[in-house]
């Protein structure tokens, strides 16, 4: 199931990206010889007078073959023969569609799931199944003290347990059904986050959002993720983060497996993050990527002529570097899975 979810998610993101290129190319009457979903050997195809629509064996990936994309090629009404502004729109359309998809997903999830508002009172709303205190505490218990330290609001619990993280057991004063009770609770170590926990969660309520509120949520969330993504790429290329910490396609499968345990909203959220990441990646000014091609179009728009032979060589070199980069990350992902 994890494999299927990952394939569908990545396939959808790439399909939407290529659809942007395809629709704008058709809008400007550029000949499109093929629109492919997937990579590798062709499994099924539908031929029309102008375009072949194909499905290929490897379900991840896809491409749009717009005639005239090769630097220096001369095709009637081809990509290279069109005005610079039209070429810019076609190149940017894939990224735009990724961003639009992310925004729509954020809006839909906000509209359906609403906003979760947590109760600030130190009243237990849930217990971790199989947790050390599942049989000791009960939902609706109000925690008054932990090891003699007063608890006024929910956030006080984590502050106090942090101070007591060297202990294995602590005393607790709780209010249950209007009566106060003294209990002995066990602290469980959360190694991943370097803390101790009681295995409890607060009460919360779902608040439905209006269309305007959902749009506002989508806008703010999109901007936040976009800024974080740009900062992330800057950190990678500035050498502040080791490539060993970067995940590629293989690593994404592992993340999907973990996220899918928490339901469709978490899967949709991951899809949003990946869609924005792929959009930003394609905007990077690297030859062979959309961003690299856009740079050359912008130079043309401001009157700077670039030697076509050099441009062609740069795009080929950029593609080789990109494939090498993806290979390195994928090998690292596989290494991490086995270690």
Swiss-Prot record:
Membrane-spanning intervals of the chain: 88-110, 262-284, 318-335
PROSITE patterns per the UniProt record, alphabetical: ZINC_PROTEASE (PS00142)
Entry binding sites for Zn(2+): 17, 21
Leader sequence segment: none
Its EC number(s): 3.4.24.-
BP-aspect Gene Ontology terms: proteolysis
Keywords, in A-Z order: Cell membrane, Hydrolase, Membrane, Metal-binding, Metalloprotease, Protease, Transmembrane, Transmembrane helix, Zinc
Cofactor: Zn(2+)
Domain PDZ: 96-179
Major location category of this protein: membrane
Record GO cellular component, one term: plasma membrane
Catalytic residues, chain numbering: 18
Family named by the database record: Belongs to the peptidase M50B family.
UniProt protein name: Putative zinc metalloprotease FN1322
């Amino acid at each position: 199931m994890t494999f299927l979810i990952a394939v569908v998610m990545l396939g959808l993101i790439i399909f939407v990206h290529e659809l942007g290129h395809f629709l704008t190319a058709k809008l400007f009457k550029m000949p499109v010889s093929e629109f492919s979903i997937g990579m590798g050997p062709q499994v099924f195809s539908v031929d029309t007078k102008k375009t072949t629509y194909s499905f290929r064996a490897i379900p991840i990936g896809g491409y749009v073959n717009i005639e005239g994309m090769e630097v220096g090629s001369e095709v009637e009404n081809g990509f290279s023969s069109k005005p610079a502004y039209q070429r810019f729109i076609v190149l940017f359309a894939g990224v735009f569609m990724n961003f639009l998809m992310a925004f729509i997903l954020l809006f839909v999830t906000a509209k359906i799931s609403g906003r979760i508002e947590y109760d600030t009172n130190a009243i237990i709303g849930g217990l971790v199944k199989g947790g050390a205190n599942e049989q000791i505490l009960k939902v609706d218990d109000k925690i008054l003290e932990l090891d003699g330290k007063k608890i006024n609001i929910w956030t006080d619990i984590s502050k106090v347990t942090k101070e007591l993280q060297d202990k294995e057991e602590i005393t607790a004063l709780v209010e249950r059904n209007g009566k106060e009770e003294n209990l002995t609770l066990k602290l469980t170590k959360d190694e991943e986050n370097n803390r101790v926990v009681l295995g409890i969660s607060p009460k919360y309520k779902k608040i439905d959002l209006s269309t305007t509120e959902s749009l506002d949520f989508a806008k703010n969330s999109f901007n936040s993720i976009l800024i974080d993504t740009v900062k992330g790429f800057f950190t990678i290329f500035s050498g502040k983060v080791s490539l060993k910490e970067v995940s590629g396609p293989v690593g994404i499968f592992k993340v999907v497996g973990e996220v899918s345990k928490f339901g469709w909203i978490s899967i949709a959220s991951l899809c949003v993050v990946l869609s924005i990441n792929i959009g930003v990646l394609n905007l990077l000014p690297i030859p062979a990527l959309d961003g690299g091609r856009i740079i050359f179009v912008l130079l043309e728009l401001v009157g700077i002529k670039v030697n076509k032979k050099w441009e062609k060589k740069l795009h080929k070199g950029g593609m080789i570097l990109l494939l090498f980069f993806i290979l390195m990350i994928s090998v690292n992902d596989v290494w991490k899975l086995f270690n």
